[in-house]
């Protein structure tokens, strides 16, 4: 019913409104605002909202760390007011309010109705029916008149209409002030409204200036100038005055004086007193208990002395709850106070105080003249500039003087700020005019509002108290109220937490902590904080604060006391700057005032108040609401921030006399014990942070995922700083405090003695966390993630932290895990045994489990997985850290070793806890990391003990140190090739040599000679500097080598040109992201030398200078330097013969031997030197690898360099040089092999790979840095070349060394191959084909034979090899094991879509060799023939590598048919083929023809069997005397014909073997009866018969007998030459000399090969000749003569015995041949 009547009333009221009002009504209604609500409805609504005031509408944003002091929370009431007036102008706002009839004639009513305040119109209007307070007209008022006045006021009711109107409009006026660009008219209107409200209350009075003389009255200001001003008509306006002896200024505002004792005795939670155990914290149940034991207090009276106020209280009550303590603030108000309390709520005064505080800052800024030329900022900066000038002049400024000057300036600045509770003194202006003291209307109203709020302290809500306390921290009062206000707020908040019906949320906690931390605002002496820097130092043109050197000199703290800006205390309530000048960086007036008002005493008080609150708080009181992530995290960050700031601010420790609030209380045992416990707990730094984790540990796991990453990082860093780092220092046995660099500031560590080192500071935390499994898992998860991020960040190279900081962080992470595991183990022990007990070592040893190679306790599955993950991350972090250490960082490595593996605790207490933590520490720290640390320390010691020659040049000294560290095995960053060239070019120019780089092509030869002449007369590098320069260049070039095929083939100038071309391409595209390592390396150096167009020519000149220096000093340089120069192609390889020539003669043999021994030691100890030697051997001594020029079998020096081939030498000179170079190369190979065999055990070898102890799948390995990739590549190349060296040495010495020595070398080779396989990438260029070739070639040389059933079948699933080589008993099984390991790499490369011809050929050759060793090969599934066909499709590739292709076609039976696709190419390119390639083509064609013939025969036999024609199947195969019909493809016959003509055309130059291969190939393709065959045969018989040996005749006899048409003619033609050959054999055998044997054996065969040839010759003769007894007798004589010659040429009895055994074979062959010819009487000759 009431709602209906109200709605009707609203409709009627709407119809009678004027058009303007109707428009406003529609406007507001369209914006969701009701304008027709009656006044009483608004008042009820406001009262209801006041009761709900305790709950703010919006949460604190994630980035909000605190707001400015004028209201940090938007309440529901403010939201309603602001929403109703957000679209209104000031005029509309004032016109909108209705004009109640009862207030129509009042001043406020006139102001509202006319949209103007009353002082602009009728100044004589006073409230009707209300008589203003009487004014004193003469003299000072007497006591009787005052009492009469108070009596009169008490008898009448003071109206509050103006005050209520002010309550309604103050928030809107503040909004309008900001919306209108800080309009001064709004400020003046607000001041007038305040004055009128005070006038209505009787606090102020009005008078005419022309009235009687005022005595004792104080003028009240409304704006910057006084109110009295002339109006337009010349009349004077009345002014507001404050009567003398006003109760507002009779006493200053003070808080009731309480002590910490009061707080402790009135906030003890029920049931949390000391137990029967005497208050042992370890036995206290932390759920619902305080961190420290506190006893129960009995009721007793006490007196708090302070400011003359005596208050009685007991333990059940609170001094703050008594009205007497607070009523003293409004003493003398009388009936006015009662009237205000009854008719105005405390919420209205609190909200009004917020607006008053806001406008007070505004008017004070104008009154002080902030931003003018005489601003106090100028004085501050002048003082700092004077200190800076003093420091720059060389003399240190007096710190105390500078500090005193800053304090004096700050004090004078604070005196200019008007106080709220007292009247300022008279002010003397510049002109000598003395102005009477005055007070501003805003100050008076703020005084009244604060007194009314404080007098009703117990009635205010939580957030209202926060705001009032905030105002009390500003410099607005006669006395500093900050500490007293904070203490009162702490006690009130603790009591609200302890009440059973209290509705306290985490939001309340956050606002309390933020308000208390407001006391910790930086003072003027904290010159390293952001607000103080902004105040003291100007801004540079770039907009950043000038870094003054005087900053360190003038600070009253220590030089390293820097505020951690990452955790944001200095910016918690930082306001934005209000104005900015071009010449100065002007801070806000509010910031400057707070900085000037700050003090170290307040900072200590903030710390102690938070410590008191965290100590007394009941954790269960924080759990009455759901945890809010933002508020909880913001609370923790604020506590952590204060703890960090105060701990670093007062680093000298807090003795008993230095505590501000926490003093032991005499007579109160309970409070004294509690305070003493807190003080002892704070002896270890960061106690406040530990208390935060004690109270909030159960909340953090639930909010952790919902807060920002930055907040998580701050909280986790605080845990490591407050818990982990003190634990590290305690267990490590540090004798004195350690300081670590914490984000640019020094933090104080534990400073207790060894004898007093205990873990008491961790007891509360251990007790709290024992039952919280979620928080322990959170700690372990954070540690695991931190370790992973550390490994990535260290490996990325982008970190800027010092190594000591990384070491401290790593220790903190690991010790956090050990601490969490200790708490978890303690909880499990309590659950099993009902209480903590010492672990039983006997039982534990029986319940051990292996976790990642470590013996750990019988842990749950989840714990084992956590420890395994942590072990992997710890390995990766240690590896990354070791890679960053240099030789001078030995202390860091020793510190890591000391922290993790050698902890020492010298205290006698808590031995059980310490041992348990150390045991869990060893579960995370594995033995591999310990071995790596020890190895690194040994390498560092080796590097420091290395003898070096002192150099004068700084750059060369740096390179020398880097080289020494690299040779010692330390992971260092070597200079790149670009950096080396840049440094050397600059050094050469510095020493007077001009490198212009502007030569023309036609002048290069002349200038090269000039450079050589200059280098011969002027020395650029000394003999001590040249080895350093050459080795740095050599290392840089090897670093850029990626595959085996590119080692040693590129000059320095060519590499620089490659870099230039790649950089130019990237620069043209404008994109450097895809340039790879080359582009990044060039762009990182940022050198003009390389980026210029003449960089390549400058590098060529540099090469010429270095070549000349090496030529001059070759005899004085170490041999390894000469080898490095050869590797760099600075000098030719022939220079090594000079080294041998200089030592010719008996007197120098000892010196030469010493040189070789020194070189061998270098190969043993230094990887780079070994790599250089192996590179040269690989390039100059090919081993068992087919190439384009022929088959290299490693029998001598094979490959001269390109420049050597261009030189023209005589034949004798070439032979002599080749012999000398071959001798040096073989000696070098022998030295390398000996160094490899005599080296230490591989496990003791120190290389940079030893330090990579992390897992193979960790983040650092998945994303390796360029330095790690280069080092891993060099390590792999070193292993590959070592395998090649051993294989070459085995092949070279297989016939000369003893068998057991060869087997030892082969066993070493197998172990090296096993080591290199894990480093082989599954990518092109992995050199697995070379490994297979070298392995198989060594096996052939050793004489290895496989078991008959050994099968190699590809493709196949790789078998998992069991064990290692040590488990294989024989060399055969070890070889099979290695072959199984190589197979996956070979198959994956063969299955790639792109065919690599050289790789395929190497694999085919190796497989053919395995067939010779007895293995069965089945590679049909890989279609090797198709790979060769695909390769032959590229004609250019086929032309370059035709020899390799022919070798591949000849390797296996399955690939022999591939020659058909190249037959046409052989015909077309016959004139471009060399004789060796023609010979290889004849062999390939013959093998292919034989394969087709066998396939044809098998097909014919299969057809005959299918037709069941058994009789014909017998005649398919030809007998010894009947030639078989050869069926071969026509392509092969045409290819043979073309190549045969090519041989005949160059018959004079063609070797004899080439003719023999042509005849053999003709027989294979079925062209025996051709004219070309007869021409070839006749040329050989007629002109080359002296060069034919016995095996050549065997081949001729076998081919001729296959002729069908010309067999008889050929038989007749060959009879005479054959008899002549047998006569020659007989004559040479009769001489019985070695020369005759060698004459017959033109191919230099051994004796056994010659005897085998005799048997074959005898068996081949009856295939063509039947002959007579004369022929067979001649044959018998020839055989006997040759056998006798071989027997007589034998050098020992063993050879004679082997030759004697061949006699039976020769007899058997001769008897079989005679029987086959039909001469049975000759089958058993008696001549022998």
UniProtKB/Swiss-Prot annotation:
It comes from Trypanosoma brucei brucei. The lineage of its organism: Eukaryota, Discoba, Euglenozoa, Kinetoplastea, Metakinetoplastina. One of its GO terms (biological process) is mitochondrial mRNA modification. It comes from the Eukaryota. Residues 1-117 form a transit peptide. This is Mitochondrial 3' processome subunit 1. Keywords: Mitochondrion, Transit peptide. Disruption phenotype: RNAi-mediated knockdown at the procyclic stage causes moderate growth defect and reduces production of guided RNAs (gRNA) due to a block in the processing of gRNA precursors. Component of the mitochondrial 3' processome (MPsome) complex composed at least of terminal uridylyltransferase KRET1/TUT1, 3'-5' exonuclease DSS1, MPSS1, MPSS2 and MPSS3. Within the complex, interacts with KRET1. The keyword Mitochondrion applies.
């Amino acid at each position: 019913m009431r709602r209906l009547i109200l709605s009707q009333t609203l409709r009627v009221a709407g119809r009678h409104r004027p058009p303007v009002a109707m428009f406003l009504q529609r406007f507001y209604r369209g914006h969701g605002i009701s304008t027709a609500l009656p006044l009483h409805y608004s008042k009820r609504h406001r009262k209801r909202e006041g009761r709900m005031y305790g709950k703010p509408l919006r949460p604190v944003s994630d980035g909000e760390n605190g707001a400015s002091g004028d209201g940090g929370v938007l309440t529901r009431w403010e939201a309603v007011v602001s929403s109703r007036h957000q679209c209104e102008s000031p005029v509309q706002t004032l016109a909108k309010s209705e004009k109640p009839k009862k207030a129509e004639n009042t001043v406020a009513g006139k102001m509202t109705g006319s949209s103007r305040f009353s002082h602009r119109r009728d100044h004589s209007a006073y409230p009707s029916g209300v008589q203003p307070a009487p004014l004193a007209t003469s003299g000072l008022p007497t006591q009787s008149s005052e009492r009469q006045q108070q009596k009169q006021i008490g008898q009448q009711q003071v109206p509050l209409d103006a005050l209520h109107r002010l309550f309604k409009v103050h928030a809107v006026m503040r909004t309008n002030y900001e919306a209108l660009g800080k309009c001064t008219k709004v400020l003046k209107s607000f001041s007038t409204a305040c004055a009128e409200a005070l006038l209505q209350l009787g606090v102020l009075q009005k008078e005419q200036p022309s009235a009687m003389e005022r005595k004792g009255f104080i003028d009240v200001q409304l704006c910057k100038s006084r109110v009295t001003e002339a109006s337009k008509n010349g009349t004077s306006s009345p002014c507001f005055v404050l009567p003398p002896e006003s109760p507002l200024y009779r006493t200053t505002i003070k808080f009731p004086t309480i002590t910490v004792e009061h707080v402790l005795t009135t906030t003890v939670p029920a049931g949390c007193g000391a137990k029967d155990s005497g208050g042992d914290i370890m036995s206290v149940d932390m759920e619902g208990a305080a961190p420290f034991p506190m006893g129960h207090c009995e009721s007793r009276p006490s007196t708090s002395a302070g400011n003359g106020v005596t208050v009685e209280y007991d333990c059940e009550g609170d001094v703050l709850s008594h009205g007497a303590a607070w009523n003293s603030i409004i003493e003398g108000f009388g009936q006015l106070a009662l009237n205000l309390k009854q008719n105005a709520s405390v919420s209205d005064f609190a909200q009004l105080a917020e607006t008053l505080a806001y406008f007070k800052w505004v008017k004070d800024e104008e009154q002080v003249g902030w931003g003018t030329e005489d601003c106090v900022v100028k004085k501050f900066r002048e003082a700092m500039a004077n200190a800076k000038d003093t420091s720059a002049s060389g003399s240190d400024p007096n710190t105390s003087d500078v500090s005193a000057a800053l304090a004096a300036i700050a004090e004078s600045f604070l005196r200019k700020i008007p106080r709220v509770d007292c009247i300022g003194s008279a002010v003397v202006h510049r002109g000598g005019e003395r102005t009477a003291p005055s007070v501003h209307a805003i100050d008076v109203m703020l005084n009244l509002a604060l007194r009314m709020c404080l007098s009703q302290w117990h009635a205010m809500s939580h957030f209202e108290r926060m705001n009032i306390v905030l105002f009390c921290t500003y410099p607005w009062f006669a006395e500093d109220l900050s500490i007293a206000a904070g203490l009162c707020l702490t006690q009130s908040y603790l009591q609200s937490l302890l009440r059973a019906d209290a509705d306290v949320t985490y939001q309340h906690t956050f606002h309390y902590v933020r308000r208390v931390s407001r006391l910790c605002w930086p003072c003027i002496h904290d010159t390293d904080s952001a607000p103080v820097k902004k105040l003291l130092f100007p801004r540079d043109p770039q907009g950043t604060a000038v870094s003054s050197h005087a900053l360190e000199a003038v600070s009253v703290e220590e030089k390293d006391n820097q505020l951690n800006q990452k955790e944001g205390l200095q910016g918690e309530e930082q306001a934005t700057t209000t104005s900015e000048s071009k010449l100065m960086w002007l801070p806000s007036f509010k910031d400057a005032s707070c900085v000037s008002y700050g003090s170290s005493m307040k900072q200590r008080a903030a710390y102690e108040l938070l410590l008191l609150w965290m100590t007394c708080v009941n954790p269960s009181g924080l759990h009455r609401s759901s945890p809010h992530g933002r508020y909880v995290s913001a609370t923790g960050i604020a506590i952590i921030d204060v703890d960090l700031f105060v701990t670093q601010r007062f680093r000298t420790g807090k003795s008993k006399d230095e505590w501000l609030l926490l003093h032991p209380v005499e007579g109160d045992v309970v409070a004294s014990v509690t305070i003493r416990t807190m003080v002892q707990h704070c002896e270890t730094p960061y106690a406040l942070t530990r208390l935060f984790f004690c109270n909030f540990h159960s909340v953090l796991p639930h909010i952790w995922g919902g807060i920002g990453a930055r907040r998580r990082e701050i909280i986790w860093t605080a845990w490591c700083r407050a818990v982990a780092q003190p634990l590290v220092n305690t267990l490590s046995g540090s004798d004195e405090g350690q300081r670590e660099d914490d984000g640019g500031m020094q933090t104080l560590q534990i400073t207790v003695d060894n004898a007093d080192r205990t873990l008491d500071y961790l007891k509360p935390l251990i007790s709290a966390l024992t039952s919280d499994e979620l928080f322990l898992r959170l700690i372990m998860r954070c540690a695991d993630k931190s370790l992973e991020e550390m490994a990535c960040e260290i490996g990325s190279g982008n970190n800027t932290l010092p190594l000591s900081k990384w070491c401290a962080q790593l220790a903190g992470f690991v010790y956090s895990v050990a601490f969490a595991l200790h708490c978890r183990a303690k909880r499990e022990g309590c659950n099993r045994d009902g209480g903590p007990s010492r672990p039983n070592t006997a039982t534990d040893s029986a319940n051990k489990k292996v976790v990642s190679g470590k013996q750990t306790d019988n842990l749950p599955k989840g714990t084992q997985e956590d420890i395994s993950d942590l072990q992997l991350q710890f390995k990766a972090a240690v590896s990354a850290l070791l890679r960053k250490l240099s030789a001078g960082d030995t202390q860091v490595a020793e510190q890591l070793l000391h922290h993790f593996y050698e902890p020492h605790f010298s205290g006698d207490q808590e031995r059980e806890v310490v041992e348990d933590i150390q045991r869990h520490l060893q579960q995370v720290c594995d033995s591999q990391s310990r071995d790596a640390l020890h190895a690194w320390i040994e390498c560092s010691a080796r590097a420091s003990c290395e003898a070096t020659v002192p150099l004068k040049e700084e750059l060369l000294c740096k390179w020398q140190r880097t080289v020494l560290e690299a040779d010692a095995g330390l992971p260092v960053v070597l200079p790149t090739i670009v950096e080396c060239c840049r440094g050397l070019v600059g050094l050469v120019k510095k020493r007077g040599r001009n490198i212009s780089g502007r030569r023309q092509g036609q002048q290069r030869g002349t200038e090269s000679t000039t450079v050589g002449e200059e280098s011969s007369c002027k020395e650029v590098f000394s003999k001590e500097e040249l080895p350093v320069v050459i080795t740095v260049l050599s290392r840089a070039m090897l670093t850029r080598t990626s595959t085996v095929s590119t080692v040693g083939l590129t000059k320095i100038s060519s590499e620089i040109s490659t870099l230039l071309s790649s950089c130019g391409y990237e620069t043209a595209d404008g994109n450097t992201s895809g340039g790879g390592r080359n582009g990044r390396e060039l762009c990182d150096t940022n050198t003009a030398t390389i980026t210029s167009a003449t960089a390549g020519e400058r590098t060529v000149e540099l090469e010429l200078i270095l070549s000349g220096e090496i030529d001059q000093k070759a005899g004085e340089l170490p041999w390894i330097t000469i080898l490095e120069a050869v590797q760099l192609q600075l000098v030719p390889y022939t220079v090594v013969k000079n080294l041998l020539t200089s030592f010719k003669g008996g007197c120098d043999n000892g010196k030469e031997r010493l040189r070789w021994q020194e070189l061998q030691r270098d190969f043993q100890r230094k990887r780079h030197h070994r790599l250089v030697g192996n590179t040269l051997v690989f390039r100059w001594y090919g081993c068992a690898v087919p190439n384009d020029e022929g088959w290299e079998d490693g029998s001598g020096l094979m490959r001269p360099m390109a420049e050597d081939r261009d030189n023209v030498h005589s034949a004798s000179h070439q032979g002599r040089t080749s012999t000398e170079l071959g001798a040096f190369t073989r000696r070098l190979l022998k030295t390398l092999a000996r160094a490899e065999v005599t080296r230490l055990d591989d496990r003791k070898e120190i290389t940079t790979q030893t330090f990579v102890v992390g897992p193979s799948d960790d983040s650092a390995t998945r994303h390796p840095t360029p330095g790690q990739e280069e080092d891993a590549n060099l390590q792999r190349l070193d292993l590959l070349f070592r395998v090649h060296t051993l294989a070459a040495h085995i092949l070279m010495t297989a016939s000369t060394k003893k068998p057991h020595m060869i087997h030892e070398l082969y066993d070493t080779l197998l172990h090296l191959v096993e080591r290199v396989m894990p480093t082989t990438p599954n990518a092109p260029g992995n050199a697995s084909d070379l490994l297979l070739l070298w392995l198989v070639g060594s096996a052939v040389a050793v004489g290895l034979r496989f078991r008959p059933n050994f099968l190699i079948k590809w493709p196949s699933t790789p078998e998992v090899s069991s064990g290692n080589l040590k488990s294989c008993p024989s060399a055969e099984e070890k070889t099979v094991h290695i072959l199984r390991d190589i197979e996956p790499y070979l198959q994956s490369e063969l299955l790639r879509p792109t065919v690599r011809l050289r790789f395929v050929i190497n694999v085919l050759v190796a497989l053919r060799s395995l067939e010779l060793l007895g293995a069965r090969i089945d590679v049909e599934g890989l279609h090797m023939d198709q790979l060769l066909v695909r390769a032959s499709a590229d004609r250019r590739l086929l032309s370059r590598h035709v020899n390799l292709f022919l070798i591949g076609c000849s390797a296996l039976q399955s690939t022999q048919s591939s020659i058909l696709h190249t037959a046409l190419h052989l015909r077309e390119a016959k004139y471009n083929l060399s004789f060796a390639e023609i010979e290889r083509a004849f062999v390939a064609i013959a093998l292919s023809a034989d394969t087709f013939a066998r396939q044809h025969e098998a097909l014919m036999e299969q057809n005959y069997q299918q037709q069941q024609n058994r009789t014909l199947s017998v005649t398919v195969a030809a007998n010894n005397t009947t030639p078989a019909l050869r069926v071969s493809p026509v392509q092969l016959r045409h290819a043979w014909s073309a190549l045969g003509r090519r041989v005949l055309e160059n018959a004079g130059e063609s070797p004899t073997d080439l003719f023999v291969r042509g005849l053999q190939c003709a027989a294979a393709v079925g062209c025996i009866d051709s004219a070309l065959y007869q021409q070839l045969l006749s040329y050989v018989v007629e002109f080359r018969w002296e060069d034919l040996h016995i095996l050549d005749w065997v081949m001729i006899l076998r081919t001729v007998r296959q002729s069908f048409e010309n067999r008889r003619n050929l038989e007749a033609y060959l009879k005479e030459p054959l008899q002549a050959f047998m006569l020659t054999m007989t004559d040479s055998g009769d001489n019985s000399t070695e020369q005759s044997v060698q004459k017959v054996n033109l191919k230099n065969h051994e004796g056994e090969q010659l005897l085998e040839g005799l048997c074959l010759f005898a068996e081949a003769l009856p295939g063509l000749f039947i002959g007579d007894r004369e022929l067979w007798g001649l044959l018998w004589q020839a055989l006997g003569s040759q056998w006798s010659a071989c027997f007589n040429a034998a050098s020992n009895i063993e050879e004679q015995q082997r030759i004697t055994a061949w006699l039976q074979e020769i007899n058997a062959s001769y008897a079989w041949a005679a029987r086959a010819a039909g001469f049975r009487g000759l089958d058993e000759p008696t001549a022998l």
